[in-house]
């Protein structure tokens, strides 16, 4: 027990709790709830976690503090539970208080800004080695029992540029490494661990061969799944391209690290399953008999981190032009150099009726027929002129439209020396949308990275451009290609010697492993052979098979025992596609299926090693001239010794060639980058994701970019944006909304104070009183719906057209309604939550709307929980035929940036413990309430959520205080031809729908 306690002490309370029931893992998609914590504290195995010193209880303190804050207001008082009696009560507390980043007082901002700046090149304490860390986790990182991390005080400036980089690098790296480290520890504590929401275990893992292509040498692994359930590989989070896997044959005392570089479904659906992995050590292992256990951390995704980490390591204070803003939080009033030199610009792109106008960009534009509202015009001018421009765009305010107009104006006025303009977004979809609109305006655009199904974008990817463009260094490039081909041929020739049922004695002889007499004895002892074999000449492989006799043991992978399908590691297909696009790029490593020559090393037999022989006896047997004189019971062990020597000799030569291969590949990449830079200089706008910005930073730096726009900037961690500040950069434009979803990170503790990793650069700068522009006129929500978020966006006004959105057929004048109920939630058996009553009500209400003429594609069903999303999708499929089932179902986290006419929102949470989980997050609540244009219908426990968060309180108060239209009740009003019907049960709604369809 002491050993187990010693191993587990460093786990967070969440991870410790996941191991209470041996192989049956209880996992959470949010922090543990009070009853869970209480049970953990009573459990003897985990008592040391809660009774340790302050450092080891920080996780617990954070969790308990977080839970307490969910149900208390700013004075620590419980919210009055009686909504009916307190309709007129309104919180005086500002909603901004609920967005506070930590307990640091606002005066810390001022004190931080007044710090005396240190030497920019002075290294941060205890961080001298961070720039030398390798691109993959080290053995020490993955097995260490303690990790020292820097705090990240987001109020005020950093001590120095080095301190700034070091903090973000180390926190990002820990976010990437932590899931892997905890996976290793979890396996060590319980080697019989089956699976869970953050760790997957695979058995009987063997290297079956290698695919050798022009860009990678990848091992094909065969394996079985320990989950005891069938895997829906097409939508599983398991073994995604770019994920890291760890292989070990000694219970993870040591292990090899590999990157999944291909996951063809044809291979995954086999038994044993197959994937392609690139090992990160410069080593090729040939022995297919060696069996490993493989684990992966499914809660993190290494590919999303590694390019950012590498970019941060390469930044230098002497070539970073925006230290004053980003490091020291100085005022961002400076004008961009290119506009300072020539402030007179044409602004035709924002004028009505094809008008033309030249203005001084540094002065107010004055009256005119603009297609922008006043706040958009202010944001537009900021984008054109400021070195650092920060634009907050609340829902529906047209921030992407303003961005497009600013880029069009820059293209119309800017001299070629400041082109091309970089545009980076969090998602591939957002990048493609901007580029398509610019294409339609006649801009010369190019897309970096990502395969795409859109033909317009496909035509402007750098891969397509390169295919049709000649380059001046073709001869040098061809020389590198020929070098690579020669190396590939040498490598494949060596491997082919093992692409046989048995490695021949001729090969063993050629390597000096057996003697000439031993080789000849195999071929010449025909008398012995004829006594055990039938007619005819025998090949050398057949002779070896005869010689081995019963020492051959056929290799059989045990069958998998499965019961049902795995659900906990499923992922939304759109999200999976987005992740895969980030891992893949044309002509690069990550592929659905690798292109190249495959050398099959899979062996049919194992060879019996059972022997009571001592090493001296084995050494004697190895020298017997006639191998037929070796006793049959010893032949398996002797042949194994020969194989081990053969593998060792071949691997030594292969690894030598592999090092040359990698050296030549670096030359190839260097030429490819030069060629790409030449192509990119021909574009006016280059689009990519923020991951792509880091992946291709070496190329982009060659073209000396002057202007960079970051869309969705509040939804991106600070680390990936820092490298966007190229040495040549004159202007950085950040567009986003810090009131909506924050960036995601893998490790819960790192989101909290003092690490604050989930605070974006955008939010940090705004919170430090940096000047920013907020758009104030929304064009999405009907005013009735917009009022639900008025406590978040106090100055948000409505564009005139929103007042005249058509009403919802079958709902009279009701555009927003909260159906409150007390039906208890349930657990889906894993981590997520479901509420069957809400799902059934939601589905039947959707059917009702369709029966009244609402088009299915204009309805979105939203929920905070993945399991509820899956349940709603299943019920919709059962209730609607394929022709009608075009209803979008999504989680709130997956729907930011989207909108629809009608949104049906399932809150799920309903329990007697007053726990609401995700519903306590004001950022998620803000997103959920601001997606609908014409109708928003909420299903949940109004009393419960009102107590959880001031934003819910204000929204529910708004619904209750509307004297003209009912907004909240325990019965849902339906306006039918037969009159108004009130329902509060799915069966009642089903009955209404059946009557409607009969008519």
UniProtKB/Swiss-Prot annotation:
Disulfide bonds: none annotated. One of its GO terms (biological process) is siRNA-mediated pericentric heterochromatin formation. It is found in: Cytoplasm; Nucleus. The keyword Metal-binding does not apply. It comes from the Eukaryota. The keyword rRNA-binding does not apply. It holds the Pfam family AAA_12. One of its GO terms (molecular function) is RNA binding. The modification Phosphoserine is found at residue 94. ATP binds at residues 393-400. Residues 61-90, 106-131 are annotated as: Disordered. It catalyses: ATP + H2O = ADP + phosphate + H(+). Gene3D superfamilies: P-loop containing nucleotide triphosphate hydrolases (3.40.50.300). One of its GO terms (cellular component) is nucleus. Its EC number is 3.6.4.13. Cid12, hrr1 and rdp1 interact forming the RNA-directed RNA polymerase complex (RDRC). The RDRC complex interacts with the RITS complex via interaction between ago1 and hrr1. Clr4 has a role in mediating this interaction. Has a role in the RNA interference (RNAi) pathway which is important for heterochromatin formation and accurate chromosome segregation. A member of the RNA-directed RNA polymerase complex (RDRC) which is involved in the generation of small interfering RNAs (siRNAs) and mediate their association with the RNA-induced transcriptional silencing (RITS) complex. RITS acts as a priming complex for dsRNA synthesis at the site of non-coding centromeric RNA. This is Helicase required for RNAi-mediated heterochromatin assembly 1. It comes from Schizosaccharomyces pombe (strain 972 / ATCC 24843) (Fission yeast).
């Amino acid at each position: 027990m002491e050993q187990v306690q010693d191993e587990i002490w460093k786990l967070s309370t969440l991870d410790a709790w996941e191991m209470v029931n041996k192989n049956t893992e209880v996992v959470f998609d949010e922090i543990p709830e009070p009853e869970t914590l209480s049970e953990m504290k009573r459990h003897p195995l985990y008592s040391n976690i809660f009774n340790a010193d302050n450092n080891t209880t920080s996780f617990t303190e954070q969790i308990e503090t977080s839970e307490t804050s969910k149900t208390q207001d700013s004075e620590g008082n419980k919210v009055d539970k009686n909504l009916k009696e307190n309709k007129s009560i309104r919180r005086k507390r500002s909603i901004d208080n609920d967005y506070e980043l930590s307990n640091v007082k606002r005066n810390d901002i001022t004190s931080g800004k007044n710090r005396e700046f240190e030497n920019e090149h002075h290294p941060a304490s205890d961080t001298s080695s961070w720039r030398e860390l390798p691109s993959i986790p080290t053995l020490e990182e993955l097995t260490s029992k303690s990790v020292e991390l820097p705090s990240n005080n987001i109020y005020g400036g950093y001590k120095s540029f080095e301190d700034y980089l070091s903090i973000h690098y180390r926190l990002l790296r820990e976010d990437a490494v932590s899931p892997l480290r905890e996976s290793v520890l979890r396996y060590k504590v319980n080697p019989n661990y089956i699976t869970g929401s953050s760790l997957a275990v695979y058995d009987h893992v063997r290297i079956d061969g290698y695919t050798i292509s022009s860009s990678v040498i990848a091992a094909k692994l065969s394996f079985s799944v320990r989950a005891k359930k069938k895997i829906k590989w097409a939508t599983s989070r398991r073994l995604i391209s770019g994920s890291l896997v760890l292989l070990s044959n000694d219970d993870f005392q040591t292990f090899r690290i590999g990157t999944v570089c291909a996951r063809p479904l044809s291979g995954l659906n086999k038994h044993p399953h197959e994937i392609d992995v690139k090992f990160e050590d410069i080593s090729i292992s040939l022995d297919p008999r060696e069996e490993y256990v493989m684990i992966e951390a499914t809660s993190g995704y290494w590919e999303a981190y590694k390019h950012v980490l590498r970019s941060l390591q390469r930044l230098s204070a002497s070539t970073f032009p925006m230290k004053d803003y980003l490091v020291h939080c100085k005022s961002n009033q400076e004008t961009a150099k290119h506009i300072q030199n020539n402030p007179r610009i044409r602004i035709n792109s924002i004028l009505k009726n094809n008008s033309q106008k030249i203005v001084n960009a540094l002065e107010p534009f004055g009256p005119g027929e603009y297609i922008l509202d006043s706040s958009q015009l202010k944001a537009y001018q900021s984008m054109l002129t400021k070195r650092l421009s920060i634009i907050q765009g609340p829902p529906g305010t047209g921030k992407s439209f303003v961005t497009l107009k600013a880029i069009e104006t820059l293209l119309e006025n800017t001299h070629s020396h400041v082109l091309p303009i970089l545009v980076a977004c969090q998602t591939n979809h957002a990048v493609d949308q901007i580029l398509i609109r610019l294409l339609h305006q006649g801009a010369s655009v190019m897309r970096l990275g990502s395969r795409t199904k859109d033909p317009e974008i496909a035509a402007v990817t750098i891969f397509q451009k390169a295919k049709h463009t000649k380059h001046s260094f073709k001869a040098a490039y061809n020389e590198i290609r020929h070098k690579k081909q020669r190396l590939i041929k040498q490598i494949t020739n060596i491997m082919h010697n093992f692409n046989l049922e048995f490695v021949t004695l001729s090969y063993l002889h050629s390597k000096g492993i057996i003697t000439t007499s031993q080789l000849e004895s195999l071929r010449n002892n025909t008398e012995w052979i004829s006594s055990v074999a039938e007619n005819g000449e025998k090949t050398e492989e057949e002779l070896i098979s005869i010689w081995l006799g019963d020492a051959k043991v056929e290799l059989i992978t045990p069958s998998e025992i499965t019961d049902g399908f795995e659900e906990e590691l499923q992922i939304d297909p759109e999200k999976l596609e987005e992740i895969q696009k980030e891992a893949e790029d044309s002509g690069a490593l990550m592929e659905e299926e690798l292109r190249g020559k495959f050398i099959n090393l899979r062996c049919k037999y194992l060879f019996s090693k059972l022997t009571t022989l001592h090493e001296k006896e084995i050494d004697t047997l190895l020298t017997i001239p006639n191998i037929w004189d070796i006793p049959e019971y010893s032949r398996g062990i002797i042949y194994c010794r020969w194989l081990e020597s053969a593998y060792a000799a071949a691997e030594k030569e292969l690894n030598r060639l592999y090092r040359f291969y990698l050296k030549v590949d670096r030359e190839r990449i260097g030429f490819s980058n030069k060629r790409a830079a030449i192509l990119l200089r021909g574009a006016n706008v280059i689009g990519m994701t923020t991951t792509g910005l880091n992946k291709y930073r070496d190329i982009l730096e060659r073209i000396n970019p002057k202007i960079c726009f970051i869309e969705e900037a509040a939804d991106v961690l600070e680390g990936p944006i820092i490298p966007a500040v190229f040495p040549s950069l004159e202007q950085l434009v950040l567009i986003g909304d810090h009131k909506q979803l924050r960036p995601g990170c893998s490790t819960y503790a790192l989101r909290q104070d003092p690490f604050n990793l989930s605070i974006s650069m955008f939010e940090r700068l705004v919170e430090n009183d940096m000047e920013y522009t907020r758009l104030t006129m929304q064009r999405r929500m009907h005013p009735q719906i917009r009022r639900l978020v008025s406590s978040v966006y106090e100055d948000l006004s409505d564009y005139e057209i929103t007042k005249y959105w058509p009403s919802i057929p079958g709902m009279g004048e009701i555009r927003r309604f909260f159906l409150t109920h007390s039906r208890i939630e349930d657990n889906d058996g894993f981590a997520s939550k479901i509420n069957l009553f809400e799902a059934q009500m939601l589905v039947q209400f959707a059917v009702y709307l369709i029966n009244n003429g609402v088009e299915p594609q204009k309805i979105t069903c939203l929920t905070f929980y993945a399991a509820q999303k899956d349940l709603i999708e299943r019920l919709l499929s059962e209730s609607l035929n394929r022709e009608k089932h075009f209803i979008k179902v999504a989680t709130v986290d997956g729907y930011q940036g989207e909108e629809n006419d009608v949104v049906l929102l399932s809150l799920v949470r309903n329990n007697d413990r007053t726990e609401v989980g995700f519903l306590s997050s004001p950022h998620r609540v803000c997103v959920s309430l601001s997606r609908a244009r014409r109708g928003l219908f909420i299903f949940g426990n109004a009393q419960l959520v009102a107590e959880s968060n001031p934003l819910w309180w204000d929204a529910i108060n708004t619904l209750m205080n509307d004297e003209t239209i009912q907004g909240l009740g325990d019965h849902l009003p339906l306006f039918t031809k037969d009159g108004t019907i009130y329902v509060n049960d799915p069966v009642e709604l089903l009955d209404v729908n059946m009557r409607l369809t009969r008519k």
